[in-house]
């Protein structure tokens, strides 16, 4: 199964319409929907924010898209077809369009929304999907800089994403990462590691 390596943004203009493509690798439907909502909030005045996600979660495929007010099947569907052609999963995309005053027609919309998805996927780089797990890390405040250095230094290697940080008597952090990180985490001193 293939996905994309990184979150990224692409942008281009077509007949004065501005297209911005946002893409992010995701592991769950909830993560995809949160990403889509965050992009819509960034562009509340956009003419259209066309959402799309394709997620394999617990052995079930969730593939959802819509046209966000564009004529039927001229926005979400051509973007979805790009994911089918490239065989990419566990990804969320939002194509934001600002209308520039010149109508593109159905064919122009189809081409440009497909182009947005294709450019975004290519820029985010297709890679083999690696299953991620959730880890809870618990440690004393005095190890905060050491833990942050470890997580930052290994972010790419293990695909680390910090989901939550809580500071009370101790620091508790919830992360998503490739399973290979577990051995490294367990070798660290003075840290409690729980794999969810």
Language model regions located:
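Ordered, amphipathic secondary-structure segments that act as subunit-interaction surfaces
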Residues: 63, 70-106
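Short amphipathic alpha-helix segments
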Residues: 139-158, 182-184
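Short glycine-/aliphatic-rich beta-strand segments at the starts of folded cytosolic domains
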Residues: 127-141, 171-175
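Long, charge-dense
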Residues: 114-132
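Conserved structured catalytic cores and adjacent interaction surfaces
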Residues: 108-110
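C-terminal regulatory domains involved in ligand/effector binding and gene-expression control
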Residues: 1-73, 155, 162-164, 187-188, ...
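Non-DNA-binding regulatory cores of transcription-related proteins
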Residues: 160-178
């Amino acid at each position: 199964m293939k996905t994309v390596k990184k979150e990224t943004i692409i942008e281009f203009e077509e007949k004065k319409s501005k297209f911005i493509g946002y893409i992010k690798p995701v592991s769950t439907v909830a993560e995809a929907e949160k990403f889509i909502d965050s992009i819509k909030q960034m562009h509340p005045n956009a003419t259209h924010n066309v959402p799309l996600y394709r997620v394999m979660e617990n052995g079930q495929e969730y593939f959802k898209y819509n046209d966000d007010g564009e004529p039927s099947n001229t926005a979400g569907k051509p973007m979805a077809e790009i994911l089918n052609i490239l065989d990419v999963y566990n990804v969320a995309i939002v194509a934001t369009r600002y209308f520039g005053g010149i109508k593109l027609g159905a064919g122009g919309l189809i081409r440009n929304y497909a182009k947005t998805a294709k450019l975004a996927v290519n820029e985010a780089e297709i890679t083999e999907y690696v299953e991620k797990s959730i880890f809870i890390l618990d440690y004393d405040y005095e190890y905060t800089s050491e833990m942050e250095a470890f997580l930052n230094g290994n972010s790419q290697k293990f695909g680390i994403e910090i989901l939550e940080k809580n500071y009370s008597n101790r620091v508790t952090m919830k992360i998503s990462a490739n399973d290979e990180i577990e051995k490294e985490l367990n070798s660290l001193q003075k840290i409690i590691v729980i794999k969810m």
